[in-house]
Amino acid sequence: MFSAFRDTASIGFSDTHQDEKTLRFLKKQISQFIKHLKEYYPNNELTKKLVMKYSDVQLLPYTKGATKDTYTSGLFDHTTGVIKIAPRDGLGNVRDEQSLNKSICHELAHGTRVKYPGESSHSDEWKDAWKTFLKIAADELGWKIEVPCSSVSFYGLTKDDCENCVWDQDPETCPKTAKLA
């Protein structure tokens, strides 16, 4: 069942209990976020698209990331509307609330658009939705959300995009990928 963790720490009974707690946390957070959108932004296109597409959240087993020494923290299945979020990092350690909240906002933003074959998942339209969701979650719901250097390097986030997020370092000091340089 947990063979995907072969390269990481071994998983025991208490770990699966922690994963179950993580799933309950994800369900609670997403429910709170969507309820907030429906109440305060009922006519907004992002709300309409997300409510139409989102169906559930599940845990994502460990998957190696697209670049060296990374893991896939989440994904949005456009066919089913299911968000899958990794409960553990690449070392097999349980992710904290700030990290999970970042993934929630990131993946919910994917649910606001239609992705066509061959098109980038991280389009400008998606980035705008993600920035909007980060601000709503941090400013209006009081969520603690991490913004690691990778979010600056890969997606071009700036302090202005989420002033109340928890930045792991000054965004100006984060390396830029060739795509953003």
From Swiss-Prot:
Transmembrane segments: none annotated. One of its GO terms (cellular component) is viral capsid. Keywords: Capsid protein, Late protein, Virion. The keyword Glycoprotein does not apply. Induction: Expressed in the late phase of the viral replicative cycle. Its main location: virion. It is found in: Virion. One of the minor capsid proteins that constitute a network internal to the major capsid proteins and outside the lipid membrane. The minor capsid proteins glue and stabilize the capsomers. Interacts with the major capsid protein. This is Minor capsid protein P4. It comes from Paramecium bursaria Chlorella virus 1. The lineage of its organism: Viruses, Varidnaviria, Bamfordvirae, Nucleocytoviricota, Megaviricetes.
